[in-house]
Amino acid sequence: MPYALLPPQANAQTPDLILAQEQHWLRDCARDSQPRAHLWQAPQCLIVTRKDTRLPRYEAACKQLAAEGWPVHVRDSGGTAVPHGAGILNLSLLLPRTTTDLGHYYHLLGAPLLTLLAEYGLEGNYDFVPGSFCDGQYNLVIGGRKITGTAQRWLAPGQDHNGAVLAQAMLLVAGDVDEGTRMASRFYELAGGELRFAPGTSTTLAQQIHWQGSEEALVDSVRGRLARLLTEGQMPSP
């Protein structure tokens, strides 16, 4: 299906503002049933879940990580803490709620990403990757290593709408993913949580295609390809 590609948010420089804007778009989608797509990036940070904010030393962890250059932000979708930065491209799909099948929306989310990977000569699949951050059965995986994490948030039906689904993916395009993995673990260590993640469980597109150019150039190329796939709707059906 073709998506309406939402414009970059010039004033939304922080993840908090970007994520808040997506909640407005989600309500718009619930009312008009038009699928939308949003490609975005965040500066270096960790984005955690509402559940994580209830950890016993959460506030102290946020203060320490901000001092180390990894400020903490909160999202409404599920999962665990995840790293963000210049080498990570995020895809958010805002979808009308047409079924209660979680897998349906994850496959809609995965379709353009799998097509993108194929354009780079890579074959991805869905699978768990034990030890990776935000692990789940709808990770996109290459050679047993995670290249995309996924999550969802549902807006329940209301009096004037049938509900909508926000499906989010973070594509690891470039950068030091092991450092990001270590910092996600450090959040839980500092906050008093039990989760820990293992370096070597994730990979990047740059690693997989042996990219020799700049990380920014690769991210720009990926963004352009994904924008084309999303707006033209030339992906296999989920």
Range-by-range predicted roles:
Residues M1-T100:
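N-terminal lobe of the biotin/lipoate ligase/transferase fold
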Residues P83, D101-L109, S132, F197, ...:
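Short, contiguous, pocket-lining structural segments
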Residues Y120-L122, K146, R153, P157-P238:
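Long, positively charged amphipathic alpha-helical accessory segments at protein N-termini or as interdomain linkers
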Residues P56-E59, T99-H104, V177-R182, S214-E215:
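Short, conserved charged micro-motifs
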Residues Y126-K146, A151-L155:
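Beta-rich nucleic-acid/ligand-interaction surfaces
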Residues A60, L108-T115, A217, S221-R225:
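Long, highly charged amphipathic alpha-helices
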Residues I88-G131:
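Contiguous, small/hydrophobic- and glycine-enriched helical/loop subdomains that border
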